Design a protein with these regions (language model features):
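Intrinsically disordered, low-complexity regions enriched in Ser/Pro/Gly/Gln/His and often acidic
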Residues: 36-38, 65, 86-87, 133
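Short, low-complexity N-terminal intrinsically disordered segments enriched in polar/charged residues
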Residues: 1-62
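A solvent-exposed, acidic/Ser-Thr-rich amphipathic alpha-helical stretch
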Residues: 55-117
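A beta-strand edge to alpha-helix "cap/lid" segment located at domain peripheries
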Residues: 1-25, 99-156
Length: 156
């Protein structure tokens, strides 16, 4: 019975796999991961942590969308456990609304791992407040025109 089911399962599974191509002209995975790390850590999180929200918003596509799940379980300052913000100008406004709370908490965002795909990547990061408090989260980012187009963050 298993011998007949397994090939059917494999065929069905393979239908959903994306075609893979390799090219010598493509940058290595390490180069792309480093580029995406810089985009995420330095251009996005460091700008947010430093209060430079306009610089942070410069890495966003005009039609960007953020899906943000509450990372700190005890964080009652975030209005909702889940927030969906669409459009670069609305995201900048949302960041400005969050800035006072983030500054008061002293939180910093630290990217730990970046996994690279084709115009998208996932990451694992930690947000730290003071010496003792931290919360890990994971995220997924899709790029368009080398800018953040889709950004989803959930607790780890």
């Amino acid at each position: 019975m298993i011998e007949t089911i397994a090939p059917i399962f494999v065929e069905e599974f393979e239908k959903h796999l994306l075609p893979v191509t390799f090219s010598e002209s493509l940058p290595t995975g390490a180069d792309v991961a480093e580029e995406y790390f810089r985009l995420l850590q330095h251009s996005w999180f460091d700008s947010i942590d430093g209060g430079d929200l306009v610089s942070a918003s410069e890495v966003l596509h005009e039609h960007a969308e953020i899906k943000h799940y509450r990372v700190w379980t005890g964080d009652q300052n975030q209005a909702e456990p889940f927030e969906l913000i669409s459009g670069k100008s609305n995201i900048l406004l949302w960041l400005q609304q969050q800035r006072t709370r983030l500054a008061a908490s002293g939180r910093k965002h630290l990217v730990k791992t970046v996994l690279v795909g084709n115009h998208e990547f996932s990451f694992r990061a930690e947000t730290i407040a003071g010496q003792q408090q931290s919360a890990c989260f994971i995220g997924w980012i899709k790029l368009r025109d080398q800018l953040i187009y889709r950004y989803t963050v959930v607790p780890d």
